[in-house]
């Protein structure tokens, strides 16, 4: 049997690059070291004021500066969920090296459980406290679940399929599976696949309910 085929005779799919931004670290090596050490990432919440919450600790992604990936202007036009997802994708693409495929053969499947909740919460607060004229014109493109897939595609010039998978905690794994399908059915030669999420005060409050 050809080394290019699996035991079912299907084309083998290779992972050529990886990127990660998570509580255990902001690169593959540091995350692997943290996991092997069995180190807990739980700590007091610093992303927002959690003093009124019943639960005031969580696992945050720390030591991450989205400006280094977006620049000082563009970073304000993206939700934190996109900051994390795009940065991880950019690192994965860099580690993969030459992609070896035309832009129309490069696809993106970026998963999320919900999407830009930070943007949603902030703009709902603005709407009710300061009026509709103060809502950000970037509100919809910042909070929609497929924002990360769109940003990755546009910034890297990919013109193949680009979409979001939203299946709760299974979303990232489902995205990888969809990437495999795209390659096997000939819809793409390269797929950037993974998941991203960013918790907020409201999500912490919801999960803390008894």
Residue ranges and their predicted role:
Residues 30, 34, 81-88, 171, ...:
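Generic hydrophobic secondary-structure packing signal
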Residues 20, 74-85, 137, 141, ...:
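Short secondary-structure transition/capping motifs
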Residues 47-98, 119, 145-159:
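A glycine- and small-residue-enriched flexible loop/hinge segment at structural boundaries
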Residues 2-10, 25-26, 37-45, 94-105, ...:
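Acyl-thioester C-C bond-transforming condensing/cleaving domain
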Residues 1-74:
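ACP-dependent fatty acid/polyketide chain-elongation machinery
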């Amino acid at each position: 049997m050809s080394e290019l085929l699996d035991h079912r005779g299907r084309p083998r799919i290779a992972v050529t690059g990886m990127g990660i931004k998570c509580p255990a670290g902001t690169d593959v090596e540091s995350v692997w070291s943290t996991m092997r050490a069995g180190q807990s990432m739980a700590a007091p919440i610093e992303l927002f004021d959690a003093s009124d919450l019943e639960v005031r600790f969580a696992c945050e992604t720390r030591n991450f500066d989205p400006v280094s990936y977006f620049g000082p202007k563009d970073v304000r036009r993206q939700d934190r969920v996109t900051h994390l997802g795009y940065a991880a994708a950019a690192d994965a693409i860099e580690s993969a090296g030459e992609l070896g495929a035309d832009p129309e053969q490069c696809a993106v499947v970026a998963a999320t459980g919900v999407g830009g909740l930070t943007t949603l919460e902030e703009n709902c607060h603005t709407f009710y406290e300061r009026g509709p004229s103060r809502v950000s014109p970037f509100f919809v493109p910042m909070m929609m679940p497929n924002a990360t897939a769109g940003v990755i595609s546009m910034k890297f010039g990919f013109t193949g399929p680009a979409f979001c998978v939203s299946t709760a905690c299974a979303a990232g794994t489902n995205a990888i599976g969809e990437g495999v399908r795209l390659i096997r059915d000939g819809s793409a030669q390269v797929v950037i696949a993974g998941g991203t999420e960013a918790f907020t005060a409201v999500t912490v409050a919801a999960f803390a309910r008894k």
